[in-house]
């Protein structure tokens, strides 16, 4: 009888557990109560799922001890483009000398992974390995990696996070020339030899889409090339916004594939994995009842995601791109197509926001045309009814976020690209850099962003079977933000720009810590954040 009673109790507990699991709901919009956090924790993602944080070299290291890169050149030449505060990455978090504090904070978070990048010009100051390697740069990364491994934090290393050595840009315009393939390959070969015994997860290029579009179509990012009439203030040092983005993207894919082939051919014995990182967005029809808007959203998917994913899976560009772009779109030779197709063990996907899509005439050819116009799509953050997809993402950019977008993007990649192994390599939100220390630390907006996206991430894994193995919050700490300087903060830890040794977990960092530990609790509710309490009263309640 006791045995039967015991079995019945076990059954009831199991049933209750399953029921609780099935009843997980995710809020799509404010208020994000995150009421499901008692069952939404790291424990619900599997014991081998990696939860970490991310950063990049130019944004955190500072310029000490390395060669000049294109962001140095760009930010000094066009300071107004590098941030409205006219700041740059010359001095940022100074992680080059304060990396021990970074590792200490990751240990405090109980993070199990850290995605960071090598500064190419810190290891190879003049761009080409044949011109010399800086031992101090190698030692810096060895020390960092060793410290991570001591704390059981898995390193994910990005080889190129947009900071190309300036010498290669000066000599042959960087990714505009195929010479970059060999130089990138030589640099990667050095890194595999030097660090491959410790690093088992390699990323070739961060956000393949970004450098071609922002660096060569709009000129808003390094190296700052565009057609003369695209930047009316004449702040591009040359370029063709209609053709160069496609050439740069093509050479990036060829360089990526060459490096993956090198790793698989010469370093398979290291038992690691390698892949690229994509920036992703979800595109909703501006008017869901209008077939033209539905078609525009899918066309945008092809120009935004398919531009890289079709070559990486099939060895060719999307049919719609070949049809619209025509001769401006390079072709792969048969050998190149074979090399590019399948050149990844995993995909890193960065996700931040969702936008609405509606058709817009493509003005090509014209003096103000850019490759971004070829899709013939106008992107907005409001739909035909004037509705926004979710809460404010960045006040200065009038942008909004949509947590369920991460669900749709992951399902899209699973369905369209044969359910690849995926890591979420960036996901986060900015807060104003003008906030006081107390306001910056009490970042409940970031908690709501993180927990709402993690909820939908778990939901898509469970409901759709998407093969996601890790999540990296952006960012480890406040840092220099490309094109915004220090006017925004993305960190889970606070950095005092007047005293760089002053670094502490924000409320979001403490929440993420509890989430990783499996003890996450509800964040402070939105109604408190919007309450009529005076600023002093709020500070007192928050113990600032």
Swiss-Prot record:
Family as reported in the entry's similarity comment: Belongs to the glycosyl hydrolase 1 family.
Enzyme Commission no: 3.2.1.147
Protein name (record): Myrosinase MB3
Catalytic machinery residues: 426 (nucleophile)
Compartment(s) where it occurs, according to its Swiss-Prot or TrEMBL record: Vacuole
Catalysis: reaction(s): a thioglucoside + H2O = a sugar + a thiol
Glycosylation sites: 110, 240, 331, 382, 517
Residues holding L-ascorbate: 207, 281
Tissue expression from the record: In vacuoles called myrosin grains of a certain class of cells, myrosin cells, distributed in the cotyledons and the axis of the embryo as well as in different organs of the growing plant.
GO MF annotations, alphabetized: beta-glucosidase activity; metal ion binding; thioglucosidase activity
């Amino acid at each position: 009888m006791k045995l039967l009673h015991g079995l019945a109790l076990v059954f009831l507990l199991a049933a209750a557990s399953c029921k609780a699991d099935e009843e997980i709901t995710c809020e799509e919009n404010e208020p994000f109560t995150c009421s499901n956090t008692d069952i939404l924790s790291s424990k619900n993602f599997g014991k081998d799922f990696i939860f970490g944080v991310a950063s990049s070299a130019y944004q955190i290291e500072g310029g000490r001890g390395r060669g000049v890169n294109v962001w140095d050149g760009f930010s000094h030449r066009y300071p107004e483009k590098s941030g409205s505060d006219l700041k740059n990455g010359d001095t940022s978090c100074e992680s080059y000398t304060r990396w021990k504090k970074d590792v200490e904070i990751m240990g405090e978070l109980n993070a199990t992974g850290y995605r960071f990048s090598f500064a190419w010009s810190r290891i190879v100051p003049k761009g080409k390995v044949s011109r010399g390697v800086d031992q101090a740069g190698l030692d810096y990364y060895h020390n960092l990696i060793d410290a991570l491994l001591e704390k059981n934090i898995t390193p994910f290393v990005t080889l190129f996070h947009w900071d190309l050595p300036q010498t290669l840009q000066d000599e042959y315009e960087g990714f505009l020339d195929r010479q970059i393939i060999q130089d990138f390959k030589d640099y990667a070969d050095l890194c595999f030899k030097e660090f491959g015994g410790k690093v088992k997860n390699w990323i070739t290029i961060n956000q393949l889409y970004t450098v071609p579009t922002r660096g060569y179509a709009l000129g808003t990012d390094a190296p700052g090339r565009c057609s003369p009439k695209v930047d009316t203030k004449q702040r591009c040092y040359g370029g063709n916004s209609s053709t160069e983005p496609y050439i740069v993207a093509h050479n990036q894919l060829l360089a990526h594939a060459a490096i993956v082939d090198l790793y698989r051919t010469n370093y398979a014995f290291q038992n690691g994995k390698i892949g690229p990182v994509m920036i992703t967005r979800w595109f909703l029809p501006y008017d869901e009842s209008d077939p033209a808007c539905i078609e525009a959203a899918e066309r945008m998917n092809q120009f935004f995601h398919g531009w890289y994913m079709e070559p990486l899976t099939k060895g060719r560009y999307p049919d719609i791109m070949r049809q619209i772009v025509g001769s401006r779109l390079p072709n792969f030779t048969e050998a190149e197509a074979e090399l590019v197709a399948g050149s990844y063990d995993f995909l890193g996907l960065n996700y931040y926001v969702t936008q609405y899509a509606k058709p817009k005439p493509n003005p090509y050819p014209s003096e103000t045309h850019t490759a971004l116009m070829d899709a013939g799509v106008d992107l907005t953050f409001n739909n035909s009814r004037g509705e926004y997809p979710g809460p404010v993402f960045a006040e200065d950019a009038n942008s909004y976020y949509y947590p369920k977008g991460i669900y749709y993007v992951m399902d899209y990649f699973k369905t369209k690209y044969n359910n690849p192994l995926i890591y979420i390599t960036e996901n986060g939100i900015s807060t104003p850099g003008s906030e006081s220390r107390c306001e910056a630390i009490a970042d409940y907006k970031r908690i709501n962003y993180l927990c709402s996206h993690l909820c939908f991430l778990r939901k898509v894994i469970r409901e759709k079977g998407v093969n996601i193995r890790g999540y990296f919050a952006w960012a480890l700490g406040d840092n220099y933000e490309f094109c915004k300087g220090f006017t925004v903060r993305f960190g889970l830890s606070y950095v005092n720009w007047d005293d760089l040794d002053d670094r502490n977990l924000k409320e979001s960092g403490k929440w993420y810590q509890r989430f990783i530990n499996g003890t996450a609790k509800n964040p402070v509710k939105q109604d408190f954040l919007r309450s009529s309490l005076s600023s002093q009263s709020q500070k007192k309640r928050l113990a600032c």
